[in-house]
Amino acid sequence: MNIALIAHDRKKELMVQFCMAYCGILAKHNLCATGTTGKLVAEATGLRIEKYLPGMQGGEQQISARVSYNEIDLVLFFRDPMSSSEYEPDVHLLARLCDMHNIPIATNVATAEMLILGLDRGDLDWRNIVNPKAR
């Protein structure tokens, strides 16, 4: 499966900790991330991550483009609900695209944990039919 990782600045450390905790599961999949998030997670975990531009330079839009082509199977987007509204258009676009293509998205660690454990159980195997290239 293709998994996208995105985290607002104040949530990057939480994303790193989450990926360290679930490194064994994440290592079985193809990972991509916005630039800074990907760099931090890769350095902390040793996971192989395709890195896009930093979020504020278009990385979220690059991931959104892959979502629009149904090339991403799961999005983990740890967003900061207290951040300024400058991020909101990107967040809404990505969420809308995930809804359009039935791509699971977690915007907090509680939901991310449920999705990652479901992924490990095989609950998301139906995505292999939708996106056979992600195997």
Regions found by a protein language model. Name each.
Residues 30, 47-58, 126-129:
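Short hydrophobic/aromatic-enriched beta-strand-loop microsegments
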Residues 95-115:
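Short, acidic/small-residue loops that bind anionic groups at enzyme active sites
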